[in-house]
């Protein structure tokens, strides 16, 4: 039977085994269909607040001109905004019992030792309308091998830089929401496992595009880094890396097509990317991850918590479970 990398939220053993074997797992049943639909409606409202008119329809590329500032508020791959997007519904998903359960399982840590992180949403646009007319301007760009790491290899794989990364994290002042994005990619193997996640809000078929990865690649990247260390020694503690044609061992790719409500969690050392959409359907996701609380000292945790609570209180968003 062909591996599909999907495991139920009620299969903890299967979740852990899949993650450890392949570096990624699609955990099904994390959100209900109703919760997904509520989130899709929330995304529609967010887009409206960013300037889309009543004539705009997220499913119909013929209407996309009714969001004049689209290219200002989202990038080519479909990520909306440059700051974390914080709303009641998105927070419900961030702190959902099944989300906390999933991350607790994979990290091997109690839920109260993990911190929910605040990120953005993704709306990957269709390249066809329902009549088959083409809209290539909305295609997700792809340059093979089309994979990257959401960490800087130099700072992540080199254990001698662990103290530098720890210091960098704890120097974050959290006087801006931007720091909630800055913290995302800062880690080091010495800290233990580092996980990243994508919550799928709609059914995602292979041809719809989406998450792809090199199965088991997280086991190869440490030795790849050692061989390529000299050319990789640059950048900042929270950087990233885009693979190129020299990185032949990561050319092979697999996808994880999945039903709505599936949370794909993958390892920071796993080469991954996005396969472009080829259809008239959309893909919609919430970027959703957790990190170990131990990476921050108490003063940093207090600054971070204050920033989040102040923002939520100012915007009338109830948040009593941080």
Predicted regions and their residues:
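Residues that flank catalytic or metal-binding motifs in active/ligand-binding sites
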Residues: 86, 117-119, 143, 193, ...
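Non-heme Fe(II)-dependent double-stranded beta-helix
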Residues: 1-21, 28-170
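Short, solvent-exposed loop/turn segments at secondary-structure junctions
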Residues: 23, 31-34, 122-123, 128, ...
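Residues immediately flanking
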Residues: 109, 149, 201, 267-268
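A structural signal for short, well-ordered beta-strand segments
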Residues: 121, 197-199, 286-290
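Catalytic core of non-heme Fe(II) oxygenases with the double-stranded beta-helix
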Residues: 131-248, 253, 297-301
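Non-heme Fe(II)/2-oxoglutarate
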Residues: 5, 53-56, 210-213, 218-245, ...
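Catalytic palm active-site di-aspartate
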Residues: 23-24, 261
């Amino acid at each position: 039977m062909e591996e599909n990398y999907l495991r139920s939220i009620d299969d903890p053993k299967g979740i852990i085994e899949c993650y450890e074997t392949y570096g990624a797992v699609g955990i099904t049943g994390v959100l209900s269909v109703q919760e997904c639909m509520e989130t899709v409606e929330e995304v529609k409202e967010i887009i409206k607040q960013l300037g889309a008119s009543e004539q705009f329809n997220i499913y119909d590329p013929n209407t996309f001109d009714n969001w004049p500032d689209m290219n200002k508020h989202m990038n080519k791959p479909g990520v909306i905004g440059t700051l974390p997007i914080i709303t009641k519904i998105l927070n419900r998903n961030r702190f959902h019992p099944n989300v906390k359960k999933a991350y607790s399982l994979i990290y091997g840590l109690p839920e109260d030792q993990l911190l929910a992180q605040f990120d953005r949403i993704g709306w990957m646009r269709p390249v066809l309308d329902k009549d088959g007319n083409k809209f290539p301007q909305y295609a997700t760009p792809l340059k093979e091998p089309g994979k990257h790491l959401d960490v800087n290899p130099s700072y992540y794989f080199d254990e001698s830089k662990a103290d530098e990364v720890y210091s960098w994290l704890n120097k974050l002042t959290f006087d801006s929401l931007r720091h909630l994005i800055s913290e995302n990619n800062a880690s080091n193997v010495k800290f233990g496992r580092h996980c990243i996640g994508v919550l799928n809000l709609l059914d995602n078929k292979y041809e719809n595009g989406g998450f792809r990865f090199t199965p088991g690649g997280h086991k190869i990247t440490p030795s790849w880094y050692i061989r390529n260390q000299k050319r990789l020694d640059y950048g900042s503690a929270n950087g990233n890396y885009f693979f190129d044609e020299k990185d032949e061992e990561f050319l092979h790719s697999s996808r994880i097509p999945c039903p709505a409500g599936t949370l794909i969690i993958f390892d920071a050392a796993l080469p991954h990317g996005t396969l472009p959409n080829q259809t008239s359907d959309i893909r919609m996701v919430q970027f959703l991850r957790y990190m170990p609380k131990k990476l921050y000292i108490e003063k940093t945790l207090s600054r971070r918590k204050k920033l989040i609570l102040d923002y939520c209180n100012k915007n009338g968003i109830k948040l009593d479970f941080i």
